[in-house]
Design a protein with these regions (language model features):
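Conserved SAM-binding strand-loop segment of SAM-dependent methyltransferases
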Residues: 88-100
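Conserved SAM-binding motif I beta-strand of class I
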Residues: 66-71
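Conserved SAM-binding loop of SAM-dependent methyltransferases across substrates and taxa
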Residues: 53-64
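Conserved class I S-adenosyl-L-methionine
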Residues: 140-174
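Conserved alpha-helix/loop element of class I SAM-dependent methyltransferases that forms part
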Residues: 18-43
Length: 271
C-alpha cells in the first residue's frame, strides 16, 4: 500500500531548475541538518533507509563520505539518481530495497539514517530492529519519527481538511506559501494528510527500541533535557527524568507541530 502511494507521487521531489547549491541552501536552513553534517566524519560510510528522492543523500555526500540511498520506490530512486548526475555528485549510490529485507551488509555502515520512514511501516519496532543491524559496532543510528504529542496539530489540520475535501487546510506553512512550487505543495499535502499508514511514538517508546537492540541511547533532537544546548548530536545528553521528558514533548506541539511533528533519536551501536 505504501509502495503504491509513493510510486504515484515520489516525495519530496525536486523543484524546477534546482541546483546543488540551492539544495544545500534549503537543507542548511535546518539546525538539525547542519548539526548532523558537522557530527559525521568526512570519511564515513552512510546509508539512508527510505531516502525518497535523495535530497539528504546528496547533501551529505561531501568530502570523502560514501552515501548509499535505499528505498522501496523505483520512481523516487530514479529522481535521486538523475539529480546526482545532473549535480555532478559522484560518491552516492541509490539502491532499490525493502526495509525488512534490505540486502545490505550487516554491520557495514558508520551512520545509519532514516527520517520519516519507520512510522509508515506496519511494525515500526520490527523495522527498527532490521535497520539497527546495518550499523557497525560503535556506529551511529539516527531515526526520525512522528511524535505522539507533536503530531496532534497535524491531525487536527487533517480533520479540517477532510471536512473541506482538502481545499482548505488551516495553518499549514507549506500549503499557505503561495510562492512554493505547486508540485511541492501537492506532494506535501499527500504525504502529511493522505498517507494510508501512520503511527506516532513517544520518546520513551523509541528509546526502548534502542535498548532492546543493543543500541546505546545518546539523545533526542530537539532535546528532552531542559537547558541542553550542547550542539553535539553524537554526544550523550544529561540524564533526564520522566516528567521532564513528558513536558518537553508537550511543548513540541508548538515548536514542531507546524512541521509535521517529526523528532529524532540518536544512538550508538554497542561494541
Amino acid at each position: 500500500m505504501v509502495h503504491r502511494f509513493y510510486e504515484r507521487a515520489p516525495f519530496p521531489g525536486y523543484p524546477p531548475n534546482d541546483s546543488l547549491t540551492a539544495l544545500r541552501a534549503r537543507a542548511g536552513r535546518s539546525e538539525f541538518v547542519r548539526l548532523l553534517d558537522r557530527a559525521i566524519a568526512g570519511d564515513a560510510r552512510i546509508v539512508e533507509i527510505g531516502c525518497g528522492t535523495g535530497q539528504m543523500c546528496l547533501y551529505l555526500a561531501r568530502a570523502d563520505r560514501v552515501v548509499i540511498g535505499a528505498d522501496l520506490t523505483r520512481a523516487s530512486l530514479a529522481l535521486g539518481a538523475a539529480a546526482a548526475r545532473r549535480f555532478g555528485v559522484g560518491r552516492v549510490q541509490f539502491v532499490e530495497t525493502d526495509l525488512l529485507r534490505p540486502g545490505l551488509g550487516a554491520g557495514a555502515f558508520d551512520v545509519v539514517y532514516s527520517a520519516g520512514v519507520l512510522h509508515h511501516t506496519p511494525n515500526p519496532r520490527e523495522s527498527f530492529a532490521t535497520l539497527a543491524r546495518l550499523a557497525k559496532p560503535g556506529g551511529v543510528i539516527v531515526v526520525g519519527v512522528y511524535n505522539r504529542y507533536a503530531r496532534m496539530p497535524s491531525r487536527l489540520r487533517r480533520l479540517m481538511g477532510r471536512l473541506t475535501g482538502f481545499r482548505f487546510v488551516p495553518f499549514d506553512p507549506v500549503l499557505r506559501d503561495r510562492q512554493a512550487d505547486a508540485s511541492r505543495r501537492q506532494a506535501w499535502l499527500r504525504d502529511q494528510y493522505l498517507h494510508p499508514e501512520e503511527h506516532r511514538h513517544a520518546a520513551g517508546e523509541v528509546r526502548s527500541w534502542f535498548s532492546d537492540n543493543g543500541v546505546e541511547y545518546l539523545r533526542t533532537f530537539p532535546s528532552v533535557v531542559f537547558g541542553d544546548d550542547s550542539g553535539e548530536l553524537f554526544a550523550p545528553a544529561a540524564d533526564d527524568w520522566s516528567v521532564e521528558t513528558w513536558l518537553a514533548q508537550v511543548g513540541w506541539m508548538w515548536t514542531l507541530g507546524h512541521e509535521g511533528g517529526l523528532f529524532f533519536t540518536i544512538g550508538r551501536r554497542k561494541r
